[in-house]
Amino acid sequence: MIRKTQAIVLRTINYGDQSKIVTFFTRSFGKLTGLVKGYRNPKGKFASVLEIGNDLDLVLYKKDTREVQLITEAVLRAPMLGATSSLEQLSALHQTLELIRLTTENDDAHLGVFELLHATLQKINVSRKNHISFFFYFQVQLISLLGFRLNFQKCVLTGKSLSEKALPKDARVVLLAEHGGFALQLAAEERGFAGMPVSTDAFKAVQWLSLVAIESVENLFLEKLVINEIFQLLDSYFRFHIDDLPAFRSREIFNQLVF
């Protein structure tokens, strides 16, 4: 059946002499793998359209019994990044695309996830600073959409507020992934839970990202130590909930160059 949908390019792999296997995240079908014939022909109709992160209108011949669908047409809606892009932009882009590819299943449509991905990529593309903050925003929001929301507002052991006003200055928090949130370190120790210690700066940052609109994220500047801590914090939570999650190759590559 011929189907049309909006799609974002997640990954491309050469196939044969002229073709590519392309992974998309689509508005209508979720993650989808397609065969694009003749893509590598410089005079072909797909030339330069299917670049990583591009926003497309896609036409495909979809057959539910096939794992790889045949792509018949792709029209560019908006390109992603350009020759003047910074390393931090490229890092945020590739990590966002890799995360969605590794944490979602084929043919599992989720409009909320698509709209989050689309909005995040747009902001990475046009914003002038703090691009990695958009990736962290994406992670925090994606966690909720995938069904394992983090509780940032109350201690998961005592119910006490973790808001900036309520949290004592000398208080420390730990991540208790098995409880779906954070706990006061003292309360965790009293109950025999070790948890993952989280600095005040890292906790405040991810808590703030869970509450704000994406338009505000560009203003969040993070020190390198806090950036690396948030990487570890959110990575740990994803891996607790998603079995056999592979290592993020884009993070290994870009973080050595940027952070």
From Swiss-Prot:
Keyword entries, A-Z: DNA damage, DNA recombination, DNA repair
Entry-linked SUPFAM superfamilies: ArfGap/RecO-like zinc finger, Nucleic acid-binding proteins
Keyword DNA repair: yes
Pfam families: RecO_C, RecO_N
Keyword flag DNA damage: yes
GO biological process, one term: double-strand break repair
Protein origin, superkingdom: Bacteria
GO cellular component, one term: bacterial nucleoid
Similarity comment text for this entry: Belongs to the RecO family.
Function, as annotated: Involved in DNA repair and RecF pathway recombination.
Name of protein: DNA repair protein RecO
